[in-house]
Amino acid sequence: MGFAVESRSHVKDILGLINAFNEVKKITVDGTTPITVAHVAALARRHDVKVALEAEQCRARVETCSSWVQRKAEDGADIYGVTTGFGACSSRRTNRLSELQESLIRCLLAGVFTKGCAPSVDELPATATRSAMLLRLNSFTYGCSGIRWEVMEALEKLLNSNVSPKVPLRGSVSASGDLIPLAYIAGLLIGKPSVIARIGDDVEVPAPEALSRVGLRPFKLQAKEGLALVNGTSFATAVASTVMYDANVLLLLVETLCGMFCEVIFGREEFAHPLIHKVKPHPGQIESAELLEWLLRSSPFQELSREYYSIDKLKKPKQDRYALRSSPQWLAPLVQTIRDATTTVETEVNSANDNPIIDHANDRALHGANFQGSAVGFYMDYVRIAVAGLGKLLFAQFTELMIEYYSNGLPGNLSLGPDLSVDYGLKGLDIAMAAYSSELQYLANPVTTHVHSAEQHNQDINSLALISARKTEEALDILKLMIASHLTAMCQAVDLRQLEEALVKVVENVVSTLADECGLPNDTKARLLYVAKAVPVYTYLESPCDPTLPLLLGLKQSCFDTILALHKKDGIETDTLVDRLAEFEKRLSDRLENEMTAVRVLYEKKGHKTADNNDALVRIQGSKFLPFYRFVREELDTGVMSARREQTPQEDVQKVFDAIADGRITVPLLHCLQGFLGQPNGCANGV
């Protein structure tokens, strides 16, 4: 019984987003071609992506709408924001049409840059502003905002020239739209000297100079144009779009790394069996389980896991802890939340979200509230909770890796040793992960429940969508830290597992050879070999022949049991057997520590490069997670962590974090999942 192919939707969708991000060169803006969160993220993060405003598709309706507004305004029609005041002042009337629009922009340029205060970030990043300019432009293509085509062309030119205004970080309640942030885009278009524009990454000049440099002149706003520019959800939706691109990629990354965790922890793959999820058919649960089942299918580490649980199996837990065993059930609502949020944000991206909506075909202006960003605001809260859920799962799994009683044979703190009194492995990361998780859980608290009435009680409910999107972006940055730490730890665990296998072979070879040399009976030899395989190697690696550590204790106990059970065996007297066992112990002390130390030192020096010298890496070579291991160890040039190594954990985790933040991590992700949906290899930037 297997999974239905149709259930692979979210994996397919996310891989599609990654490919779209990589491949897009031009974003068509025409009011009919959908713009996705991947397109928005690509424009925000890649300077080679251009915007193409398609006149053939939308110019006629834009100009018809603009002409209708101008005609009605000149005729003295009573239309909100055209011949009336704004918000709570809509009872006021005026025929000073252009002055009214410029007055609106002037009063909304009320943000403050808090340079010198903590936190130091006091402005929205250029990525958010460029994305907002794109979404405002797209909103106008529906032909119901009343703005001139020339203003839209100017926005297109500014985007393609990489010119955008500096915008204060705070000040928007996202209803009536993102008024204050959007006023800075309007301020750039009208050439307000107080508005500072960025040109590229380094140049900052006043708005009039920025316009001049790209061959534009300041606009004198006509009726409704100022209101159309500021009265929308574009900033909240812009940030939400890049947030959703990242959330999708990180979701798939966490899901995939759950499989890698199963391998290194010696988890049982049974938790992903299709029948378990068929009888509880939540879509996200089925999809996550299907992915994990495929990732673990034919895993070479599962062979080691089955061997591990076959020894003293009645003394070992029958099932894995929740962080692995219930991961599909835990991920189920997170998958669904992120999927639904993506759909919602993309709906907002492809919408006209201002007021009033001009229905020129029926000769009317419809006064509504498409500027209300509650759909974005609420879903940003939901996504932040989902992100906290992903972080909690990582924290639980990471904790299992750090504790020797839970990690099925791995050393505490994932310390390579051998002297654990001076090697604390990844203990610092363990502490940091607790800090990250705590902050992430705090950020999961909702923003949208903290609404205050604004603007003279006219905006008595508002969405806080931009604030919520910003906080979700912040949460994602913490999740990236947690993923970087967890992936670093799992690569360390892979190294330790492979060293463990090599060391066990050394112990078995030495025990077998010495048993033969000392003339021990076959059943005695078998008992000793059983102990050599059963005792976790990291419990005695620091001093293999210490009589107080588990290996020698186990071997002695086995010998004692043999002597008690057998007074004679194959003609050997008990006294003779005791003498031979004593000789075995003496020779063991002479040989075992030296041979184990030689293997450990070689691995510590060369790590994954020992594959050139032996078959220590045979397990990871056959794993679907090899692309991640190679990427971290080879592409990022990290190494096995030990007390003798000069580098600190921070240096390695920083490299992994940077690769997540700039999107390089999607390279091994795509390679890892290549066979799941037949996706081609690729690369990506900007997670």
Curated annotation (Swiss-Prot):
Known outcome of mutating Y322A: Abolishes the formation of the MIO cofactor and thereby abolishes enzyme activity
5-imidazolinone (Ala-Gly) cross-link, chain position(s): A175-G177
Catalytic activities: L-phenylalanine = L-beta-phenylalanine; L-phenylalanine = (E)-cinnamate + NH4(+)
Outcome reported for the amino acid change (mutating N355X): Abolishes enzyme activity
Cellular component, GO annotation: cytoplasm
Protein name, UniProt field: Phenylalanine aminomutase (L-beta-phenylalanine forming)
Gene designation per UniProt: pam
CDD domains: PAL-HAL
Keyword Ion transport recorded: no
